[in-house]
């Protein structure tokens, strides 16, 4: 029986991870007494008793918890960090098992895994294969308009939307300094900072990450079919091995519902193209709380603990 402690269990991601783990027969979740949630010693005791600790905390708090684990005597638990604190750290494995052919094995052998950001998951999923295939240059001026459900904004945003205090649709992070940009660049190989423009809509969960392209501006002037083939080739092996990323044909009605994958760990990629205009848009669809957060965390937990 694998013992798991979720540090930050009461938050949006922590609650969903707990719900998913509750369905797994070979896992025991160690919970802290709510009255002792701020008690450092109580937290330390649970960390010492766990085989794996999941950090669902703000970045600074996650760094503090890692330091606490480092000071534990004896064998230390594995860690999955859902914050942004360690995503580009060389001593941590990036928790996107479908990223490359050897990534699932790296996660399986890791002691410390950094869970990807939700937007970053979608962006990396569509950019990395196209760059690896040579269809998209590393210095290409990438634009990533994206939209998420309001649960991605944390408790205060959730309360504002559900109380009717928030707009139906809102662009945000317009200072163009979103915290997911460093990991997008790090794990795709982009050398030019992408123009990432996120927005939030009046729906709880769901996400679309879009990559619009003028095909004639790319080397080799590829077709939409070329993009689809490169994406499909990149994910064929991981999909056959049980990975959660699928490359699918464009929808017949040329529409895409951001909420269709809610409460799953799936990520779907489609290429929509107008060959006459030489335009294409590559779109990743996922649940921002699923493959974008708690679902990915549980996928990594299963690999790390051999479940």
Features from the language model and the residues they span:
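N-terminal Rossmann-like NAD(P) cofactor-binding subdomain of oxidoreductases
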Residues: 1-167, 172-174, 272-275
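C-terminal substrate-binding/catalytic lobe of Rossmann-fold NAD(P)-dependent oxidoreductases
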Residues: 12-44, 56, 141-146, 150-282
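PAPS/PAP-binding and catalytic site of the sulfotransferase fold
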Residues: 113, 227, 297
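NAD(P)-dependent Rossmann-like dehydrogenase/reductase catalytic/cofactor-binding core
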Residues: 266-268, 273-307
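Predominant activation on well-ordered alpha-helical scaffold segments within soluble catalytic domains
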Residues: 18, 63, 124-131, 181-185, ...
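Residue-level signal for short, function-critical loop segments
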Residues: 118, 217, 288
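Helix N-cap/coil-helix junction residues
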Residues: 135-136, 190, 307
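Short amphipathic alpha-helical segments
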Residues: 122, 223-227, 293
């Amino acid at each position: 029986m694998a013992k798991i402690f979720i540090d930050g269990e009461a938050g949006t991601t922590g609650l969903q991870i707990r719900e998913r783990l509750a369905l797994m027969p070979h896992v025991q979740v160690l919970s802290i007494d709510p009255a002792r949630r701020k008690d450092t010693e109580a937290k330390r005791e649970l960390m010492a008793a766990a085989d794996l600790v999941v950090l669902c905390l703000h970045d600074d708090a996650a760094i503090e918890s890692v330091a606490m684990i480092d000071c534990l005597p004896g064998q230390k638990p594995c860690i999955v960090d859902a914050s942004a604190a360690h995503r580009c750290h060389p001593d941590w494995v990036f928790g996107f098992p479908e990223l490359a052919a050897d990534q699932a094995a790296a996660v399986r052998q890791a002691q410390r895994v950094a869970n990807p950001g939700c937007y970053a998951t979608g962006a990396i999923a569509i950019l990395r294969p196209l760059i690896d295939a040579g269809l998209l240059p590393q210095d290409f001026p990438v634009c990533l308009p994206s939209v998420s459900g309001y649960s991605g904004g944390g408790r205060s945003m959730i309360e504002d939307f559900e109380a009717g205090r928030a707009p139906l649709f809102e662009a945000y992070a317009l200072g163009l300094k979103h915290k997911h940009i460093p990991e997008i660049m790090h794990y795709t190989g982009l050398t030019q900072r992408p123009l990432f423009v996120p927005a939030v809509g009046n729906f709880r969960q769901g996400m679309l990450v879009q990559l619009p392209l003028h095909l004639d501006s790319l080397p080799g002037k590829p077709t939409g079919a070329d993009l689809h083939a490169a994406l499909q080739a990149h994910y064929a092996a991981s999909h056959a091995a049980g990975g959660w990323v699928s490359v699918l044909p464009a929808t017949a009605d040329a529409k895409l519902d951001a909420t269709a994958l809610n409460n799953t760990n799936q990520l779907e990629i489609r290429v929509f193209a107008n060959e006459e205009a030489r335009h294409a848009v590559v779109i990743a669809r996922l649940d921002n709380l699923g493959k974008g957060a708690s679902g990915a965390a549980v996928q990594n937990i299963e690999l790390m603990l051999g479940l």
